[in-house]
């Protein structure tokens, strides 16, 4: 973590991540149950739509293209990544304040600093902005395997209302 953010993380795209998982899944003898959280939930939805899983569970899933939220908590939590003025080529590393609001909002304030020090990691802004791009488009009219969407009522990054829209 002390060496982060690695500038190469700024080059990572959702398409690159999806390509990796497609390769892994196509090499399996049978289709697995896919499980993902946040951006991983969106990845589960995309891979299921492509027929690469037997079923899926998406926990507080990032939204596919066209599913949006204007809820304050969503905008505040995600703005450092999705802001038009944010440099997509630079990885995002949350500040303590951003981490407290976005990730550790359900734990006691006394524990937030240690949670930040243990769990805060940089992320690719390109991946974070991907739900607004065609790579994250899902045709909801196409049949796909069963998908369970789970929403956290206190989640600031992906509010439950956004999961219901999804």
Where are these regions (language model features)?
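Conserved alpha/beta-hydrolase catalytic His-Asp/Glu region
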Residues: 92-127
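Active-site nucleophile elbow and catalytic-triad environment of alpha/beta-hydrolase enzymes
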Residues: 121-140, 144-145
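Short beta-strand/loop motif that positions the catalytic acidic residue
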Residues: 143, 149-151, 155
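Flexible "cap/lid" loop of the alpha/beta hydrolase fold
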Residues: 52-87, 126-134
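Short alpha-helix in the alpha/beta-hydrolase fold that links the catalytic acid
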Residues: 145, 159-166
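Conserved acidic catalytic loop of the alpha/beta-hydrolase fold
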Residues: 15-32
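Gly/Ala-rich beta-loop-alpha elbow adjacent to hydrolase catalytic centers
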Residues: 35-40, 44
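Short beta-strand immediately N-terminal to the catalytic nucleophile in serine-hydrolase-like folds
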Residues: 34-36, 59, 150
């Amino acid at each position: 973590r002390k060496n982060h953010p690695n500038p190469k993380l700024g080059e990572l795209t959702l398409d690159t991540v999806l390509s990796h998982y497609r390769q892994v899944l196509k090499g399996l003898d049978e289709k697995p149950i896919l499980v993902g959280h946040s951006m991983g939930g969106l990845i589960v939805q995309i891979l299921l739509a492509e027929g690469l899983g037997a079923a899926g569970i998406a926990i507080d899933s990032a939204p596919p293209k066209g599913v949006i939220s204007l809820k304050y908590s969503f905008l505040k939590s995600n703005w450092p990544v999705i802001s038009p003025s944010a440099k997509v080529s630079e990885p995002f590393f949350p500040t303590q304040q951003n981490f407290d609001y976005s990730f550790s909002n359900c734990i006691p304030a006394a524990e937030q600093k240690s949670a930040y020090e243990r769990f805060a990691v940089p992320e690719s802004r390109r991946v974070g902005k991907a739900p607004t791009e065609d790579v994250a488009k899902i045709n909801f009219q196409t049949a796909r395997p069963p998908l369970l969407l789970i929403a956290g009522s206190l989640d600031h990054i992906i509010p439950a209302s956004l999961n219901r829209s999804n």
